[in-house]
């Protein structure tokens, strides 16, 4: 094919040969540019997918874990402090962290990419609903600094009922982070 083109070009005048050669080079360069642009587009899409579903999502899972741990800390403070002002401040912090945790959980859901991640995420979310229901009950019981018996009962409930739920959810969060990291390494 190339030999036939060369023979055809040799039979033409110099001006036509130069014009034909320039046209062939321009077509080859254009084709290469289109091919390179397409390859860059595909790589960009894959890179964006990897960053969104694995790179950034690991940070989002970490933020969800931190705010979840902060809810526990603020819960303990709200039922443990004796100063009414501190109890109110830690209760407000508890509510703020609880909402932030739910917001991060919604962000994490957008990046769930595998069946295993979905299973863990669903376990976390169902456990979190139960945890926050119990934790809210404990905080309401224990934030009245004048009722010592009720505060003691709230502290026992926090230890016996809320703490095991917290541990189970946090373990699932750690597993979700591990699975997400493993999937991202592939």
PLM region descriptions:
Residues 72-75, 89, 93, 97:
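Early exported N-terminus immediately downstream of N-terminal targeting peptides
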Residues 62-66, 92-97, 127-128, 141-145:
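A short, ordered amphipathic alpha-helix with a cationic face
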Residues 79-88, 106-185:
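Polar/charged, Q/E/K-enriched amphipathic alpha-helical segments with strong coiled-coil propensity
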Residues 18-71, 84-87, 113-128, 186:
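Amphipathic alpha-helical segments and their boundaries
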């Amino acid at each position: 094919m190339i030999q036939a083109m060369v023979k055809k070009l040799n039979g033409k005048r110099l001006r036509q040969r130069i014009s034909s050669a320039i046209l062939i080079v321009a077509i080859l360069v254009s084709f290469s540019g289109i091919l390179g642009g397409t390859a860059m587009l595909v790589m960009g899409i894959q890179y964006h997918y990897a960053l969104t579903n694995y790179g950034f999502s690991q940070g989002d899972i970490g933020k969800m874990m931190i705010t979840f741990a902060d809810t526990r800390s603020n819960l303990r403070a709200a039922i443990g402090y004796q100063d009414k002002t501190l109890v109110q401040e830690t209760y407000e912090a508890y509510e703020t962290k609880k909402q932030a945790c739910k917001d991060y959980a919604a962000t994490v859901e957008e990046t769930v990419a595998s069946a295993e991640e979905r299973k863990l995420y669903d376990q976390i979310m169902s456990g979190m609903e139960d945890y926050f229901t119990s934790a809210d009950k404990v905080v309401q019981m224990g934030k009245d600094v004048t009722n010592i018996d009720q505060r003691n009962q709230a502290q026992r409930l926090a230890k016996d009922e809320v703490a095991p739920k917290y541990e189970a959810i946090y373990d699932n969060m750690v597993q979700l982070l591990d699975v997400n990291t493993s999937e991202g390494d592939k």
